[in-house]
Structures are given as C-alpha cells and as structure tokens.
C-alpha cells in the first residue's frame, strides 16, 4: 500500500472516530455541559498521548520552529472548539456544521498556494463533492432564532478557517520532524493551558458538571477524539493535505449513521440526505482515483 493510500485510510478512520466522539459526547451531554466534556477530552488527550510518548522512548530531538508552530496549532484547535460550540448555540447545530464543512477548501487552497501541492482535477472535483454532500446532510430546517445576527455566521466560518489552516501547518512541521505522536501530545498541552485560561477568564458563563451518568460517555469521547487527533496528524505526515483533508472532513455522515444506531435518533432519510451521502461517497472515490 502506498503512503498516499495509507494516509487516505487513516483519514477515513479519523472521520469515523471523530464521529464516534461526537455521538458519545451527545450521550453524556444529557447529564452534563459542553465545557465539562471539552475539559475531560483535553485531559484524556494529555494523559494518553504523553504516556505513549514516554513509553515509546521519550521526547526526540525536534526543531524549535516545529514546537512553536505546533503551539500555534494547539491554540487554533482550542479556537475551533470554542467557535464551533458558540456557533451551534447561536445559529443551531446543523447550520453551524454545514458552514464548518468548507474547511477542506481552505486547507486545499493553502496547501496549493504555500506548500506547492498539485491536486489533480479528480481531487478538486472530489473535494467539492465532499463539501456539498456534508452541507446537504448537515443542513436541516430549524426554528427562527430571535437573537440571530448575521455576524453569528462568522463563528462557524471562523472555526472552518482555523481548521483549514491547521492541516497545512501540521504538514509543513512534519516535513521538518516526522514525530506525529510528540506533536499530538504537545498540541494537547497547549489546548489544556489555553482552556484553563479561558475558564479562569469567564468563570460565570462556564459551568462544570461532574455527573456519574456522563462519565463513561465522556471517557469514550476522550478516547475517540484522542485517537482521531493522532491519526489525522499521522495521515498528514504520510500524504498530501489536498487528499487527506476532505476525507477526514466527512465525519458528519458517520455521525448521522452512528446516532441512528447508538442513540436511536431516527432522523428521516429523505432525498436530500441520500444525495448528500452519495455526494460524499463519490467525492471520496474521486479523491482516491485522483491521487
């Protein structure tokens, strides 16, 4: 199996794992809060990944520039979480998810302009199909929000932009030092520090609820999200951003399927949903054939 093919497989597994993290979090959020699951997930990420780093021989030599750039990535990742949660609160989860789905287009643009990657026509077509499919599946009619403001749309778009920037930065750093495990752990530490600062700066608006019934779902969330972070960084170390990013972004499809199976959420499968799933599948096939 070529490195590009392996990267695609890891990106696909990443999308399934991240969808599992979202579904598991949704189960726990019946008894707790988004702030709690975010902190729980970041703590597990640090515990698991730093344990793996030291179990595999400790920290290897990495350039300072790489450490600094992945520190920026960790800050961006925290920004993605906060913007995504706030966007879901302000304009609804489905609209927020649909707008965030443009992130592969941002990643591809930066990868082509700065990293010099050259996507084939099939990869470009596949990326557009994946984004269009995610929008079709994610966007659902929701009630009008009295407090809605047009600038609220910038929240999920900001999350998409930060996500799109993260992938090329990761790819660049991994060409300097191919240490995906260490950089994944470093990103978790930066996210934890940033999140604790955020909690200290806004204690009244952020509520931590430690509920027993939420414990195991949040353990699942932390485990799935940690594995998804490690695998996406490993995938980017092996393959081009223009190939990996759109495949990893197809997680809303898997979240829809898993929610029906594990949460018994019987969302209607209408023509729009079928077209969206077909578009994502066709897009992934096109990306694979165009590699």
Question: Where do the PLM segments sit?
Answer:
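Membrane-interface interhelical linkers
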Residues: 1-75, 81-91, 132, 139-157, ...
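MFS transmembrane alpha-helix packing/gate-lining sites
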Residues: 17, 76, 102-103, 162, ...
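Juxtamembrane helix-start motifs in multi-pass secondary transporters
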Residues: 34-38, 96, 182-183
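Transmembrane alpha-helical core residues of multi-pass small-molecule transporters
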Residues: 41-45, 103, 129, 187-191, ...
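C-terminal transmembrane-helix exit sites in multi-pass transporters
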Residues: 104-125, 135-137, 253-274
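Selected transmembrane alpha-helices and immediately adjacent juxtamembrane segments
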Residues: 151-175, 179-182
């Amino acid at each position: 199996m070529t490195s590009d093919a392996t990267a695609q497989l890891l990106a696909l597994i990443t999308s399934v794992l991240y969808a599992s993290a979202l579904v598991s979090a949704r189960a726990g959020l019946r008894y707790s809060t988004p702030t709690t699951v975010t902190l729980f997930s970041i703590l597990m990420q640090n515990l698991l990944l730093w344990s793996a780093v030291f179990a595999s021989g400790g920290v290897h030599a990495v350039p300072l520039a790489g450490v600094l750039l992945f520190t920026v990535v960790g800050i961006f990742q925290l920004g993605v979480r906060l913007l995504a949660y706030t966007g879901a609160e302000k304009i609804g989860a489905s609209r927020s998810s649909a707008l965030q789905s443009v992130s592969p287009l941002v990643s591809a643009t930066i990868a082509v302009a700065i990293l010099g990657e050259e996507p084939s026509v099939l990869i470009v077509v596949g990326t557009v199909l994946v984004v269009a499919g995610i929008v079709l599946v994610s966007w659902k009619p929701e009630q009008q929000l009295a407090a809605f403001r047009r600038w609220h749309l910038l929240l999920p778009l900001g999350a998409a932009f930060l996500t799109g920037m993260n992938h090329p930065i990761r790819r660049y750093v991994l060409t300097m030092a191919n240490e995906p495990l260490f950089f994944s752990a470093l990103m978790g530490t930066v996210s934890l520090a940033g999140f604790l600062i955020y909690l200290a700066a806004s204690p009244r608006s952020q509520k931590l609820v430690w509920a027993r019934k939420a414990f195991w779902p949040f353990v699942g969330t932390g485990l799935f999200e940690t594995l998804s972070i490690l695998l996406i960084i490993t995938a980017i170390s092996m393959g081009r951003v223009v190939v990996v990013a759109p495949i990893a972004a197809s997680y809303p499809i898997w979240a829809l399927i898993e929610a029906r199976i594990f949460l018994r959420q019987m969302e209607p499968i209408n023509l729009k949903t079928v077209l969206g799933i077909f578009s994502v599948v066709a897009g992934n096939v096109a990306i694979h054939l165009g590699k």
